[in-house]
Structures are given as C-alpha cells and as structure tokens.
C-alpha cells in the first residue's frame, strides 16, 4: 500500500504497547493539518522509524530526524529519528497540506481531502505516523472550524470547548472525518448509537437509530459482546458504503434508499466483529466479506423466508461471472473490484459458510463463530485460520474444507440415471450422480425425495467424493419425485437448465449487444453509449448492428436493443410465457399492460439448450441512459419494467427456470415439491 521499498525498524516483539496521544487541528481554508503526536512504546529505544505523508514539515522533539526514502509517487516519506537518550516516548510535530493520489477510483471519492467542504483521512495517505505494527490505544483531541464536528474511531468525549476521541482497543488504522454535520444520538445499553447527517433530517436519523440496537443485540448474542463504545452512521457526499471500526460511511443517496436500513446497515454493523474486530490477513484470503454477507444479507432474507432465492442468486452470480473464465481460489480473494471478484469473495464464499453450517448444525456452527471471535479478536488472520476456528478439532473435516479454499471452480452436477424397484418393505431407489468438472469435490449433497402419501419431501444428506457415484436408498413408500440440492445448499455451478432467465447470464458471458440500425440517430447514439459503458464493466460483451446479426452463431447469447430492432419480430415468440406477451410497442405482464410510450421493458429468456436471449425496449435517449446506469444492479432479474419519467421500477421479477435438469418426476402426474421448514440462524 505504501509503495516504499524498505522495512521499518521493528519496535519489539511485544503484542501490545504502541499508543498515540495526539492533538490535531484542521485548517480547512488552507487545506492544512497541524498536529502533535506523542507515540508511546512498551520499551525504551534510541531509534524510531516511521512513514508520514510527504506534504508535512516534520520536527522530532529531542531527536535528529533523517529522511530514509520517499515513495515513487512522492506522497509518503520514511523517516528515522535518532535520540541521544533511549526513551519509551517519541514526540513529533508535523504541519502542512497532505498530498493525495491523483487517481480517482470509480465513485469519484479521492484518497483523502482537507478542504472547506470537509475532511476525510485514513491510513492510505499516511496522514499520521505509521510504524511497523498496529496501535493499541489512542487519545486524539481534534480542533475544527466553528460549526464543524468530527468522527473517528473510539469513544467521543465532549468537554464543551473541545472534542476528543479515545480507545483502549487495538486498531490497524486511524480515520478522521470532519465537516458540518448534524448529529443525532441515543444510548443503547453501553453503546452510543448516532447518525451524522450533512443536511438535518430527524426522521431519517430515527429510521436508522430505531434499528441499530436490535442489530447490535442480535450479533452480541450470536458472537460475543459488541466490541466498541459506539456505532455511528455517517453521511458521505460520495456514494460509498464503507465499514470502519465503530462507524460506517454511507453516501448521501445510498443512505436515503428505503431498503438500506434492512440490508447495508446490518452488514456494516456485523463488520465490527468480522473485518474490523477480527482483522483480515489479505495475503491469506479475505474471509470476512463472505461470512459477513452470510450472517447479514442472507440472514435478513432468511427472516423473510426468502433465503433459498437468495442462495440461488448467489449461485447465479458465481456461475455467470467467475465460471466464465474469471475464477480464482478463495485463498486468493482480497477485495471486490468487479462483478467477477464479487461473485467469488462474496457469493461463493458465503455458500461455503452455508454448507459448513448445514454440515455442523446450527448449535455447533454458532459455537464455532464464538470460538473465532474469542480466539482471534484484534488479530489478523487468513481464510484457513478463520475456517479452522469455526470447525474446531475435527481435522478430517478441515482437510475437506481446505480444498474449497485452495481450488478454483465448484461441482457441476448431473443425474446420470435413476432406478426404482419395489421390494418387500417398500421401494429401493438408486441415483447415479456425476460431477462434470475437472476433479471431484468432497461434500455433502442434499437429495429431496417426495414419497407417496407424504406432502413434505424427505431430504437425505449424501456424502459425494467421486466423479461418478451411485447413491442407494431404501424407502417405505413409492418415490414420486427426485430433486438434487433443491434449496441451493451447495456451492456449485448451476446447470444451464437450472438458471432462471436473468440479465447476469448475458453480462457474465460473451453475449452480443444487437444495436438497432434503423433507430433515429439520437436513439442509436444512446444505445452506443450504453454499450460502451457496459463493455467497460463486462469485457465479454460485443456489439453488432441488427442488419449484420445473421452472421452470428445460432448458439450465441444476444441482447436485442430497442423497439426498432430488426431482430425483434422474429424473436418476440421467445419471450412468451403464461403470464407474459411481448407486443410491437409494449408488453402484457400478468394483468397489466405496459406501453413503450411510458415504460422501458426488459425481458430475458433461456432455452432448453441454454441459449439466453434478452430484449430491452426503450426509445428515448434519457430512458436508455437511465437503463445503462440501473440494469447492472438488477442482474438477477429476468423481467423488469421502469417508468420512463421517474426511473422507478414498476416490475422486477425473478423468473423460474423452465427445464431444471436436477429435478425428475417419476410418475405421470406432476408432483409439487414441498421442503421441510428451516429455522433462521439465531442464538435464541
């Protein structure tokens, strides 16, 4: 991160003992920071080495300061301080305009900022002295322009004329955020809950404050006590979703979305245990994103009875992105930087944790979560260590699960044969399962068998560890239906027949965007801009004009753009469903009729052979621009309708697959699948 080619002088082997006692003044108009920092260490020494932002003028009290090196980008400098007498406290003065990277990542938020608009500082800019270890305690007094407030890690102490931040917890990074905030706070048990807004909105603040305590209570019961003195939601003018120790930084638009208190909020609160409580050793795999997604995002869906669909979408993302040539082992995942990496570090990872929960049972899984917290809080661990803590002493199980971390890919399952024969006390069932990928995985596969006279299927848990395996069952009644992994409990590559028609099937592969050659110039240009934006995000996408589309391979996936598209007439029958009809300038969906004059319509179809065809109906440049922005966030849907004027979603449907190959009816009369109910993950 620091791009400096040397190693800092170690401060000692002790696991504790580095503390900052700081005073920081923000000179917003000039963009300067003025600071004094006394760094306390656990043993006396005569030489200290540290890294600090190169924009500062630095002075060491009672010591001689030498520059060791400056980073290639000129942003950070490494210093050595030599003292005449060994001491356990180094006092530094530094002042100046911090230098920040000129690279602006997607979303537009700079690396750091000190201006009249506000302050954002984190360790990436070395705005405070960085040593060779994390710090164990902090006391920081912050002096700001009139009317400003600050947010940082730890507990807020307001003495009237000054505000300070203090913590006795170990931390790996120090943040300073400041600006003209409106603060709303309430006490929940021993935790201060607060919302910091750039524009005052008491109702919005109350919406968050009303839920925070419930979430901290839930995770405290499940894992262990909440580790910090506060939790704060802080508004950011850039559209971020960052989780820091004891607070989250949410973009102003993000913050006001009605679903965020029920999705992002529990996710960011849980990160105070996973990621900001137990830290991630990124060189050994980022386990925290998958575990947090599982225990927050998946849990919220579980509470609503929608966990099965959530897991299906997770497998869709993994099958469509990572499996399309963009895969990597979980041990190699560090952070999300595109849809493919998200499908691995979030989707596949959470499915591995879900599979482990099913194999251990909820009681043992929760005990493992508590063990992970108790053994590793405020230490840095990789994926293997995290998994080992949850699994415990079962070394054979750990060996099996370690393979899931080390390998790319996932099982691709196929039913080879099913044999049913009567026997004196019922029926004998034999199912032959094949793993089609290179090299078998070792896992437990749920197999649901619906029996005559029983409304709810019986679910067997079968150990699978070979490329081809026959599973045999003695049943008391006649089997009517077989479903392999019907609730999507195993991290696997979905068969094409299982995949619901969805935009992600087009985004994740090598689909063709078919442009409407006869569209008016302004409309055609809008489609070209959409194509360029999507190709930057999804490198597999290619473009072709509709009058050239006859040269496409008949098996090529395609997305037909525009009501004027020459391919629409021949393809409209593909989009026929029992509740759906595509017309020349609109569509009937359920009991409603949508017109191209007022709505933009998105439909996706998948054939029995796995060919995916999509259609986007829009003919206004502003509506096309709206779809270019929105649709990448709706990848799991196969049917969408947006109001052209407001951009609001009028329809967003997840469609069911038509030809699931891992489900077999064994009798002439179709039998519905009903699975046993499940409990949500809870310590209660």
Language-model regions, residue ranges each:
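Hydrophobic helix-coil surface modules that form long, contiguous segments used
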Residues: 35, 130-266, 294-297
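Beta-strand-rich binding/interaction modules
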Residues: 57-62, 397-400, 411-485
């Amino acid at each position: 991160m620091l791009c400096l080619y040397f190693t800092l002088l170690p401060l000692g082997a002790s696991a504790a003992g580095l503390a900052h006692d700081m005073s920081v003044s923000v000179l917003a108009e000039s963009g300067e920071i003025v600071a004094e920092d006394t760094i306390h260490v656990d043993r006396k020494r005569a030489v200290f080495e540290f890294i600090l932002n190169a924009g500062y003028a630095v002075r060491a009290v009672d010591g001689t300061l030498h520059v060791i090196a400056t980073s290639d980008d000129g942003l950070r400098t490494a210093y050595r301080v030599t003292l005449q007498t060994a001491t356990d406290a180094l006092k530094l003065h530094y002042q100046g305009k911090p230098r920040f990277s000129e690279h602006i990542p997607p979303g537009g938020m700079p690396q750091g900022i000190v201006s009249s608009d506000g302050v954002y500082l984190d360790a990436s800019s070395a705005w405070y002295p960085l040593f060779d270890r994390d710090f164990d305690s902090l006391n920081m007094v912050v002096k700001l322009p009139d009317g400003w407030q600050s947010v940082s890690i730890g507990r807020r102490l307001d003495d009237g004329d000054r505000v300070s931040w203090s913590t006795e917890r170990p931390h790996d990074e120090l943040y300073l955020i400041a600006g003209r905030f409106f603060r709303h706070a309430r006490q929940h048990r021993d935790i201060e809950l607060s919302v910091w807004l750039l524009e005052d909105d008491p109702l919005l603040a109350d919406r968050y404050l009303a839920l925070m305590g419930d979430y901290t209570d839930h995770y405290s019961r499940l894992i262990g006590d909440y580790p910090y003195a506060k939790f704060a939601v802080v508004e950011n003018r850039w559209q971020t979703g960052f989780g820091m120790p004891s607070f989250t930084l949410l973009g102003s638009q993000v913050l006001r979305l009605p679903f965020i208190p029920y999705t992002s909020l529990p996710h960011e609160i849980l990160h105070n245990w996973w990621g900001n409580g137990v830290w991630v050793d990124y060189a050994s795999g980022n386990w925290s994103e998958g575990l947090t997604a599982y225990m927050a995002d998946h849990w919220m869906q579980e509470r609503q009875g929608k966990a099965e669909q959530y897991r299906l979408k997770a497998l869709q993302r993994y099958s469509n992105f990572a499996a399309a040539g963009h895969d990597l082992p979980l041990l190699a995942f560090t952070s999300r930087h595109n849809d493919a990496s998200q499908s691995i570090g979030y989707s596949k990872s959470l499915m591995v944790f879900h599979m482990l929960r099913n194999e251990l049972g909820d009681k043992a899984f929760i005990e493992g979560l508590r063990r992970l917290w108790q053994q590793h809080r405020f230490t840095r661990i990789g994926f293997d260590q995290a998994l080992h803590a949850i699994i415990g002493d079962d070394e054979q199980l750990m060996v099996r699960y370690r393979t899931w971390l080390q390998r790319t890919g996932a099982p691709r399952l196929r039913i080879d044969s099913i044999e049913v024969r009567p026997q004196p006390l019922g029926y004998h069932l034999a199912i032959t399962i094949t793993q089609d990928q290179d090299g078998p995985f070792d896992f437990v596969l749920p197999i649901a068998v619906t029996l005559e006279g029983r409304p709810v299927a019986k679910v067997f848990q079968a150990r699978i560890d070979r490329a081809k395996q026959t599973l045999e069952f003695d049943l008391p009644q006649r089997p009517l239906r077989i479903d392999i992994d019907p609730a999507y409990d195993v991290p696997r590559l979905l068969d094409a027949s299982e995949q619901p028609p969805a935009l992600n099937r087009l985004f994740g592969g090598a689909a063709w965007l078919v442009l409407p050659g006869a569209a008016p110039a302004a409309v055609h240009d809008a489609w070209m801009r959409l194509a360029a934006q999507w190709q930057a995000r999804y490198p597999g996408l290619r473009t072709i004009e509709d009058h050239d589309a006859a040269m496409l391979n008949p098996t090529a996936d395609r997305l037909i753009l525009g009501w004027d598209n020459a391919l629409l007439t021949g393809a409209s029958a593909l989009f026929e469903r029992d509740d759906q009809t595509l017309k020349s300038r609109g569509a009937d969906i359920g009991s409603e009729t949508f017109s191209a004059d007022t709505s933009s319509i998105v439909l996706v179809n998948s054939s029995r052979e796995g060919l995916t065809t999509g259609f986007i109906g829009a003919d206004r440049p502003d509506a096309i621009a709206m779809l270019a922005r929105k649709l990448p966030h709706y990848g799991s849907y196969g049917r969408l309708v947006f109001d052209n004027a407001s951009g609001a979603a009028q329809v967003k449907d997840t469609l069911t697959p038509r030809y699931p190959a891992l489900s077999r009816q064994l009798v002439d009369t179709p039998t519905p699948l009903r699975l046993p109910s499940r409990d949500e993950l809870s310590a209660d």
